[in-house]
């Protein structure tokens, strides 16, 4: 599925510095976790690793466009409650009445913002590791039956 990248917005969820200790000292690299979405029912996430931060972000964006999923949005919210677990992270998503807004924290918030859901209540249960929480949220949104 060919997508027009200009229609999508991006959010950098996490940038981390990782270290490899070698004989001559330490070698630093950077990891990036990025979420992309068109605020109209399509969202994806990706990770990238490189020696410089901008390169890691670019790799993460390329990865994110390979993992786009379609979200079934009913009005400004989702159709039903859903609970999804990925590794030790668990996310609970509940539909909310119009005007409630986006009540979500941590790494789940940018995923829900960029998916186009405007009224939702999300609760993170278990681990708040950004990588696992983003994946749990995306998988939960993909499982919703319209």
UniProtKB/Swiss-Prot annotation:
Part of the 30S ribosomal subunit. Contacts proteins S4 and S8. With S4 and S12 plays an important role in translational accuracy. Located at the back of the 30S subunit body where it stabilizes the conformation of the head with respect to the body. Signal peptide: none annotated. GO terms for biological process: translation. The N-terminal domain interacts with the head of the 30S subunit; the C-terminal domain interacts with the body and contacts protein S4. The interaction surface between S4 and S5 is involved in control of translational fidelity. The keyword NAD does not apply. Keywords: Ribonucleoprotein, Ribosomal protein, RNA-binding, rRNA-binding. GO terms for cellular component: small ribosomal subunit. It comes from Aliarcobacter butzleri (strain RM4018) (Arcobacter butzleri). InterPro entries: Ribosomal_Su5_D2-typ_SF, Ribosomal_uS5, Ribosomal_uS5_bac-type, Ribosomal_uS5_C, Ribosomal_uS5_N, Ribosomal_uS5_N_CS, Ribsml_uS5_D2-typ_fold_subgr. This is Small ribosomal subunit protein uS5. Belongs to the universal ribosomal protein uS5 family. Residues 8-71 form the S5 DRBM domain. The keyword Ribosomal protein applies. Transmembrane segments: none annotated. GO terms for molecular function: rRNA binding; structural constituent of ribosome.
